[in-house]
Amino acid sequence: MDPLSVLKEFTIRGDIDKIERVGANYRFGSEYSFPCATETAYRSKSGSLYTLEALVHYVKNQQLKHGEYMQSTVKNSVPAVTLPDRKPLLDYLTGRVASSDSIDFLLLQQQNAQSQKQNEEYRPDQDNSAFVSRENAIADMEVEDFGKSGEDVDYIMLIRSNERPLKSRDAILQCKNRDFYSVLVNSTKREEERQRIESHQRKDGLVAKSRLMGAEERGIVGFSSGGGDDNGYDANPKSKLHFKAGKIGEGVPIILVPSAFQTLITIYNVKEFLEDGVYIPNDVKAKEMKGLKPDCITVQKKFSRDRERVVTAYEVRDKPSALKPDDWDRVVAVFVLGKDWQFKDWPFKDHVEIFNKIIGFFLRFEDDSIESAKTVKQWNVKIISISKNKRHQDRAAALEVWEKLEEFVRSRSHS
């Protein structure tokens, strides 16, 4: 009979006190004897087999609390039964359950076969009739564990009892040996191409719309309030719309920014500030753009208190010397550096004329000294203050720029 079944039998009968340790063996009354280090057929949650020594010590000390039990195992140099295994093990040994998934049935059968010869040698004084009765008892326990007498053993159950999961569902889904980086790269390229096409389409539409709006404000489109046909067109318009053949952006309002790096706003970071309402330092944006400085960029107002307002596109440039005479008529705003040399070679006689025809903005940090804006205060320039750290306030500053700019453009078109 195997050690686990013998221990279960003695536990159910209440004969635990008859289990004695003699040297390196455990004696179960006068019937059985097993080495203390014998591995039983009961497997722990971690997968290892419990020794007979560990199970006997646990059964005899099952009433102890967890801390006291652990101290007892250390004191007696006995392997401990883990906390998750204790209740299922005790339920099996006390007969509350007939079997357990933790039992290695193949090992159980092997130990049963081996222990028969050992126990016969241990009890030489026992007659054959006693041995036969013990064999009958073993048969009864096997019937109890594996089914009714005469039924076949479920070998599938025995095989499954030895199965151990090698990989979990999560481990399979992780796909450690698979690399999907190429899929990500291709997807990113397609998305960037789609955004680029949409951006060009949107820009072309905004440019065309801005041209028509500018032409209407100048009164060169052939609309008339009377004297025309039913559709409102004048039969003899005073002027007609003529576009010169030129580069893209003709007719689009222009905003000038300083080319010097010591100012807060340049062609590097003006797009994020005006379109997204977020200020990014020049050096950070220049590093992101790898030092590539564009000659011209297009910005548009993406946010407004008036949601029904028409979106207008603007060109932003930082080289006034490259502007042609016709281009200066499209300049509507300038971000000033606060230095007179910024306006050198401009087609205006003084600052008064400049800021009568062009609205000026001076962007500064709110905690900068007053001396930094001393010269600017002598000009007709709008001072816009932003915080060095509170980026959530940038949107309000950008919105103030847009409102002042739109108000100036409307007043200029009506003058």
From Swiss-Prot:
Its biological purpose: Component of the PAF1 complex (PAF1C) which is involved in histone modifications such as methylation on histone H3 'Lys-4' (H3K4me3). Involved in regulation of flowering time. Required for the expression of the flowering repressors FLC and MADS-box genes of the MAF family. Required for histone H3 trimethylation on 'Lys-4' (H3K4me3) at the FLC locus. Prevents trimethylation on 'Lys-27' (H3K27me3) at the same locus.
Protein name per the record: Protein CDC73 homolog
Self-association state and partner proteins as the record states: Component of the nuclear PAF1 complex (PAF1C), which consists of VIP2/ELF7/PAF1, VIP3/SKI8/WDR61, VIP4/LEO1, VIP5/RTF1, VIP6/ELF8/CTR9 and CDC73.
Alphabetized Pfam families for the sequence: CDC73_C, CDC73_N
Source species, domain of life: Eukaryota
Lineage, top ranks: Eukaryota, Viridiplantae, Streptophyta, Embryophyta, Tracheophyta
Source organism of the structure: Arabidopsis thaliana (Mouse-ear cress)
Cellular compartments per GO CC: Cdc73/Paf1 complex; nucleus
GO BP term, example: positive regulation of flower development
Disulfide bonds: none
Tissue-level expression: Expressed in root tips, shoot apex, young leaves and flowers, especially in stamen filaments and carpels.
